[in-house]
Curated annotation (Swiss-Prot):
Assigned keywords, A-Z: Cell membrane, Disulfide bond, G-protein coupled receptor, Glycoprotein, Lipoprotein, Membrane, Palmitate, Receptor, Transducer, Transmembrane, Transmembrane helix, Ubl conjugation
One Pfam family cited in the UniProt record for this chain: 7tm_1
Entries under PROSITE patterns matching the protein: G_PROTEIN_RECEP_F1_1, G_PROTEIN_RECEP_F1_2
Lineage: Eukaryota, Metazoa, Chordata, Craniata, Vertebrata
PTM comment, free text: Ubiquitinated by MGRN1 that may be involved in post-endocytic trafficking and/or degradation of internalized receptor.
Protein name (record): Adrenocorticotropic hormone receptor
One MF term in the entry's GO annotations: corticotropin receptor activity
Extracellular side, ranges: 1-23, 80-104, 169-180, 245-256
Disulfide topology: C21-C253, C245-C251
Length: 295
């Protein structure tokens, strides 16, 4: 969010005066390289699903939704670097109307990436729940039509929320609402998880075992959720500290890691496709076919 980033620049000198922790500055080339890799990897996921009819199922469509979210996060940093480069070359007027509009568009991509990731993980969690505990009715409950409707509503809601957050980003309540979405949605997913694994344990006692493929999907979701929390939580905490205690020495010390937290977000988009490939034999085969055909 432009308001958050500008606020960071304004309080940076104050933070340094109140903390012995120097700001960690990373080369822009690192951000750019990681972002490019993230875009290419997630684009491979989308192409693999698009080219293989065997992968065109609700589960993989939900995975594609998460891949799009990751790709938007990488595109955000690429476009931001391009805007900075043009401004440094004198092609953009600092704080001009075009730059402000471009900043809003880029910031919308960033917010959309976070909201899309949270919502996509929630949908995948619900899909895994139905797969495990309503396996016989799964194909009648989770149809392609319903999956597409859910994804359409999901992205329409995320887009509207993203535009609203960017438009009113200078208001503290908006920042609070933005950061509150993160723990609230994660709480929903974790509650679903606890319920899922408690039922799985109960079912395992009454029956021989749950289908291994279904449990593999649940484990994949667990890994995806863990990586998401690890990569995004530091930034969300940074936003909260920047809003409520920017001059506190301890808060300022943590905020000196601003760029490191940014790299973690970019790394999320790079790690997720490896998780898909490692946990899904079908997707792994599709990746191999794509690589062999290109060679």
């Amino acid at each position: 969010m432009r308001h958050i980033l500008n606020l960071y620049e304004n309080i940076n000198s104050t933070a340094r005066n109140n903390s012995d922790c120097p700001a960690v500055i990373l080369p822009e080339e690192i951000f750019f390289t990681v972002s490019i890799v993230g875009v290419l990897e997630n684009l491979m996921v989308l192409l693999a699903v698009a080219k293989n009819k065997s992968l065109q199922s609700p589960m993989y469509f939900f995975i594609c939704s998460l891949a799009i979210s990751d790709m938007l996060g990488s595109l955000y940093k690429i476009l931001e670097n391009v805007l900075i480069m043009f401004r440094n070359m004198g092609y953009l007027e600092p704080r001009g109307s075009f730059e402000s509009t471009a900043d809003d568009v880029v910031d919308s991509l960033f917010i959309l990436s976070l909201l899309g990731s949270i919502c996509s993980l929630s949908v995948i969690a619900a899909d895994r729940y139905i797969t495990i505990f309503h396996a016989l009715q799964y194909h009648s409950i989770v149809t392609m039509h319903r999956a597409l409707v859910v994804l359409t509503v999901l992205w329409a809601g995320c887009t509207g929320s993203g535009i609203t957050i960017v438009t009113f980003s200078h208001h503290v309540p908006t920042v609070i609402a933005f950061t509150a979405l993160f723990p609230l949605m994660l709480a929903f997913i974790l509650c679903l998880y606890v319920h899922m694994f408690l039922l799985a344990r109960s079912h395992a006692r009454r029956t021989s075992s749950l289908p291994k493929a279904n449990m593999r999907g649940a484990i994949t979701l667990t890994v995806l959720l863990g990586v998401f929390i690890f990569c995004w939580a530091p930034f969300v905490l940074h936003v909260l500290l920047m809003t409520f205690c920017p001059a506190d020495p301890y808060c300022a010390c943590y905020m000196s890691l601003f760029q490191v937290n940014g790299v973690l977000i970019m790394c999320n988009a790079v790690i997720d496709p490896f998780i898909y490939a490692f946990r899904s034999p079908e997707l792994r085969v599709a990746f191999k076919k794509m690589v062999i055909c290109n060679w």
